Swiss-Prot record:
The gene is Lb2. The keyword Ion transport does not apply. The modification Nitrated tyrosine is found at residue 139. O2 binds at residue 64. It is found in: Cytoplasm, Cytosol; Nucleus. Heme b binds at residues 46, 67, 98, 101. The modification Phosphoserine is found at residue 46. Induction: Repressed by nitrate in a dose-dependent manner. Monomer. Nitrated in effective nodules and particularly in hypoxic conditions; this mechanism may play a protective role in the symbiosis by buffering toxic peroxynitrite NO(2)(-). Nitration level decrease during nodule senescence. Root nodules. This is Leghemoglobin-2. The lineage of its organism: Eukaryota, Viridiplantae, Streptophyta, Embryophyta, Tracheophyta.
Length: 154
């Protein structure tokens, strides 16, 4: 289990706020990165099926990516406050939705890499190993909970 320090949680919070400052741009970039890393992942998203490229200003895409980043941010705060990511109704539901959509364990490193690259681009010169580590810990701990819920739902 990976608790976060107050400093690490603050880094995640400030970079998440920068991400939120331009949701259309950053969510679009996130999905471009996901598909660069794993082109076949396109079929997992209803809003990407039948498209040749990642659509600009797509409300479903923005909402989905926004939720992903918000969940990681919330995981970071939980890790700083309690030392664990708490399983709640949202994460339980997420587990069963991911199973129904065909998400597999192998998809999690793809999302993690795209999140880290997106945040690195968002913060620019403020990127640091500590920021990378904080997002990594938060994502990894969140992924453990989601994977458990996926296994329970399967």
């Amino acid at each position: 289990m990976g608790a976060l320090t107050e400093s690490q949680a603050a880094l995640v919070k400030s970079s998440w706020e920068e991400f939120n400052a331009n949701i259309p741009k950053h969510t679009h970039r996130f999905f471009i990165l996901v598909l660069e890393i794993a082109p076949a992942a396109k079929d997992l998203f209803s809003f990407l099926k039948g498209t040749s490229e990642v659509p600009q200003n797509n409300p479903e895409l923005q909402a989905h990516a926004g939720k992903v980043f918000k969940l990681v941010y919330e995981a970071a705060i939980q890790l700083q406050v309690t030392g664990v990511v708490v399983t709640d109704a949202t994460l339980k539901n997420l587990g069963s939705v991911h199973v129904s959509k065909g998400v597999a364990d192998a998809h999690f490193p793809v999302v993690k890499e795209a999140i880290l690259k997106t945040i690195k681009e968002v913060v620019g010169a403020k990127w640091s190993e500590e920021l990378n580590s904080a997002w990594t810990i938060a994502y990894d701990e969140l992924a453990i909970v989601i994977k458990k819920e996926m296994n329970d739902a399967a």
